[in-house]
Amino acid sequence: HRLIRRQRQMCIRDSSCSKDENNNSNNFATGIVELPALRNGANDVFVTHYTTFNGQKVTSFSMEYDKSKKHSRWIAFRFDNQTKQQNVSRSDEPFDADPAIGSQYQRVQADFGKQGYDRGHLCASADRLYSREVNEQTFYYTNMSPQRNKFNTGIWLTLEGQVQSWGRSCTSSDTLYVVKGGTIDKEDQIRGYISNDRSKPIPRYYYMALLFKKGDSFKAIAFWMEHTDSPKSTKLVDYALSIDELEEKTGIDFFPSLNDNLENALEATYSTKAWPGLE
């Protein structure tokens, strides 16, 4: 049985929230850390999918979905000591409509394949291997994005694998917060439209925003990739940027629930040397 929560509005940041001036790791945020600020447009729906794992209700992933574009604005989730587990293999569950959103607002198989695009997972199947049920949820069409095969199986897959490696390094005191998406909001960041249907944009860019709480320390980094058959580089380090720079490109406020001192410090800069395997 799939447990689903639908929610149209959520207060992400409350200006009255207390601030931890010392950036104490036990009081570093005022809300769900991985969630970006919601746009809350007329066609936007916020959804979180859950499963029951080891007798506990566990968040699978969350999204802000734009019904007018039949595409998620972003997908957010976390790796921790529980969700990092690899207990199953990819299910190849039949791709299916997301039961949390009307099927008329979702893409279908005909929008991919012969159109020249893979059904590219945003939350990758390999990101969610701790149970069969959670892996099946990654095959919802709300989690799909039209990706060129060479991109989907090339540099994007390389980045996904690196992020999974970081995520699976988590111990009981660690959490890797992940946001992924494709650009659907700005006309100059749209590659085209499936069958010239403006309700089915093709992202020109894909991105990730990462925040790693490792014990009592924090680090953050972002990645921005053009959606092309011929990547500018095969080195992930060449796609790295700061969270602030990614926010400027996307117009999305990432990790807004962090206390302000920590958010400002983490998002302004990044160190590629701090991320094993990146250099």
What are these regions (language model features)?
Residues 16-279:
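Domain-level detector for secreted/extracellular nuclease and nuclease-toxin modules, and
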